Every structure is written in C-alpha cells, then in structure tokens.
C-alpha cells in the first residue's frame, strides 16, 4: 500500500530529520517549489510523494497510515539490530 502523507505529516517528517526544503529537494530530487506546494496542501503525482517518503525512510523515519491507528503520523523507526546492541 502506498503511503500518502498529509501536508502536516510531511512538514513533521522534515522537522524530525532537521532538513530545510532545499535539503529535502537535494536528497529526493523533487523541486523545492513542489515540496512547498505539498507542505501547503497542494496536490502532486503519486511518484513525487513516494520520492519524498523514500528519502525520509532512508533517514530512519516510518510513516503511520491513518488506517493503522486513530490518526496518521510519522515516527523514528528502530533500525534492525539496534535494540539487541543496546541490551548488551
């Protein structure tokens, strides 16, 4: 299932990783004006949104779909094996 985060969730994801819109543009190869439009509630092609999601996921974020909980969101994903290392 493709994740389609809202404008608020996209802004929150960008804040979590500490990126400017320019940083996100450089990593995702999506133009800064398009990112700005999306963060202000505008529409975009599915491929464009997925490029942003992929960039954030590569930084360790996980998107929470509205169907998974009582609301959508974004959070840090625990990298595989990290918990095991912390327990040693």
Language model feature labels by segment:
Residues 10, 24-25, 35-38:
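Conserved hydrophobic/aromatic packing and binding residues within compact polymer-binding modules
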Residues 15, 26, 40:
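Alpha-helical residues within the helix-turn-helix
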Residues 1-5:
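A detector for short, charged/polar N-terminal pre-domain segments
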Residues 29-44:
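Recognition helix of helix-turn-helix/homeodomain-like DNA-binding domains
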Residues 6-9, 20, 45-48:
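Residues that mark the N-terminal boundary/hinge immediately upstream of a DNA-recognition element
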Residues 46-64:
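DNA major-groove recognition helix of helix-turn-helix/homeodomain DNA-binding modules
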Residues 9-23, 81-84:
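Short basic helix-loop element that most often maps to the first helix and adjoining turn
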Residues 61-88:
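Helix-turn-helix/homeodomain-like alpha-helical modules used for DNA recognition
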